[in-house]
Amino acid sequence: MKKENNSAHNHNRGSFSGRIGYVLAVAGSAVGLGNIWRFPYLAAKYGGGIFLLIYILLTASFGYVLIMSETALGRMTRKSPVGAFEHFGKTKSFKIGGWLNAVIPMLIVPYYSTIGGWVIKYLVEYFKGNVQAVAEDGYFGNFISDSWQAELWFLVFAALVFIIILGGVQNGVERMSKIMMPVLVVLAVVVTIYSVTRPGAVEGVKYFLIPNVKNFSWMTVVAAIGQMFYSLSIAMGILYTYGSYVRKDMDIERSTTQVEVFDTGIAILAGLMIIPAVFSFSGGNPETLQAGPSLMFITLPKVFASMGFGTATGIVFFILVLLAALTSAVSLMETSVSTFMDELHWSRKKCCGLMVVIMIVLGTASSMGYGLLDFIRIFGMNFLDFFDFMTNSVMMPLAALATCILILRVVGIDGMVKEIEQSSPFRRKKLYRVFIKYFAPICLIIILLSSIANVLGIISM
């Protein structure tokens, strides 16, 4: 009886109209703040070209295997992560792995939307022509410590995400991706061309694109693994969910390759947008390159303020960042809504309402964590930093390990190969077998242990 109900429920699931819709939706999920905000500052900090080389190698191997695995499991079961794990599990405890994948986006999307609100705030200021004001020392700190301002812009971003999700898979997620992703690419190319043609930018291009072994360290590898993990939307439940929406005749291997090429291409464009501009502004000052997360909100506004077309550049850049942030936030939200629809058997509208409540409560804690709620610290971190650490450094490696265990102990590698080959020949079958059995679990354990050691002060990342 249970199987009949599930069949009926799965029959009524949303679906993508075709491979292009799926690829653009997954690319939209992968191309976000991870590419445009996180990737450039990590590349700048960890050696430029050598970081880029390691990142590309890992994406083409480790990332490829995990994207294919999660997508295939979603298509195989026609369920979001909790249902997918339950489908194969012999006991109810097996659902823990699924819930781990499902809870991650519920925790990420609130603080992600807080940062999305910051992006809208900066975009509005550039439209007002306040290019010099946003470049002033202390502007960013004063803004995020003003709790009510930060909360207002968080709610604006959250409302945009909610409106798109309410439209469903084809009318909301797919339609948004088909419009926003091409626009994002065009804007990225425009800003990149402008950035690399600035005086002194050539040195920045060389630093970013040409690997220098002298800049290599073990932390370069750890940082590249972590970035790949974050950027490709692995272990967030997104790929399970979107996989459950695709048709059985879709070529998973080809689609995975297209997603990785698109994602890596945008990451490289982001690096070329930001690093040469910073070189041009600072003359390659190492301290400027080490700015880290503040690179986009503190360093770049100073770069734009020094340009002849700073206001126009700032507008185009922050529109680009907003589009990227929206596509990723929508993917995170859709995964959570899909989980509630599967597990609670509620309507999309009702599940959206529940997710909005979660989003506002946790998002408010994050947006006010630099102001009214700054006195609350968890392991020395405010709410936003704590949610970021727990999801990216602890829960995501564990969730991906759970997927590896599910494949190795229950589904079987042969079962995965059979599912992938339903639509087309599996060209990199041998690579898949080796990586899912040995390399992926080892890499995930390295990420987990390195992140914990970093927080404990044993190593410095």
Residue map of PLM features:
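Extracellular loop-to-transmembrane helix junctions
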Residues: A43-S69, Q149, M395-A399
